[in-house]
């Protein structure tokens, strides 16, 4: 609903519902990935070269020309290493802002709509213990990039309760020092229950709107 044409996703292997709901993938492609089908007609995401639930969209056509990225939902090729998606997400967000700020890039209207794109980054709560996560959060807060980070918190990480690996057993509590305040840089931090659809829509509406204005 808030993932618009031109936006980017840098996520991980628990985004099946999102990719299906956005029609970035289909149930048939999901099972083609599961069985490692090497037929590009059945699975263009990785053509049998990656694990299942690893997604990617095409940046170029068969002739090597740039695709109209502003007309499609974009996802960078997923990586299996935990938190590996974080640095790339920052780069994609920074690219959007660069298109907005650099006059010489305005001619590439098929790549960016004047930098109005947001990079959506997903990560599990256990992977927030990785160094990549903290480096990117700090850099995004300092640089004020259009990056929206979604932390899927199910209470466990590889069967270990989050109290054993996350300060205060809550990543949102641990991140409180990054909360933006008037006259400072930082991040807007939200906490919402995944089963509360109306609540999520309200939070996403505000958060993504602010990210697009960054």
Per-region residue spans from a language model:
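Cofactor-binding active-site loop characterized by glycine-rich and histidine/acidic residues
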Residues: 1-145, 150, 161-179, 184
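Structural signature of the thiamine diphosphate
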Residues: 197-214
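Active-site proximal loops enriched in glycine and acidic residues that flank catalytic Cys/His/Asp
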Residues: 151-153, 193-196, 204
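Short gly/pro/ser/thr-enriched loop/turn and capping motifs at secondary-structure boundaries
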Residues: 155-158
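Structural signal for short hydrophobic segments within the conserved structured cores
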Residues: 187-191
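Glycine- and other small-residue-rich loops at beta-strand/loop junctions that grip anionic moieties
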Residues: 80, 192-193
């Amino acid at each position: 609903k808030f993932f618009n044409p031109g936006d980017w996703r840098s996520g991980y292997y628990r985004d099946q519902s999102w990719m299906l709901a956005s029609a970035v993938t289909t149930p048939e492609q999901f099972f083609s990935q599961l069985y490692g089908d090497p037929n590009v007609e059945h699975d263009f995401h990785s053509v049998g070269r990656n694990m299942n639930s690893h997604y990617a969209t095409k940046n170029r056509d068969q002739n090597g020309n740039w695709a109209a990225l502003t007309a499609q939902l974009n996802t960078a090729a997923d990586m299996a290493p935990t938190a590996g998606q974080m640095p790339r997400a920052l780069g994609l967000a920074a690219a959007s802002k660069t298109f907005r700020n650099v006059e010489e890039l305005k001619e590439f209207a098929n790549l960016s709509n004047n930098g109005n794109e947001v990079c959506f980054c997903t990560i599990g709560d256990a992977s927030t213990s990785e160094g990549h996560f903290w480096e990117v959060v700090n850099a995004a807060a300092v640089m004020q990039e259009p990056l929206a980070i979604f932390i899927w918190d199910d209470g466990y990480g590889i069967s270990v309760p989050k109290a054993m690996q996350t300060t205060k057993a809550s990543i949102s509590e641990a991140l409180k020092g990054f909360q933006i305040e008037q006259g400072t840089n930082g991040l807007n931090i939200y906490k919402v229950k995944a089963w509360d659809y109306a609540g999520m829509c309200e939070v996403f509406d505000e958060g993504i709107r602010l990210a697009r204005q960054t």
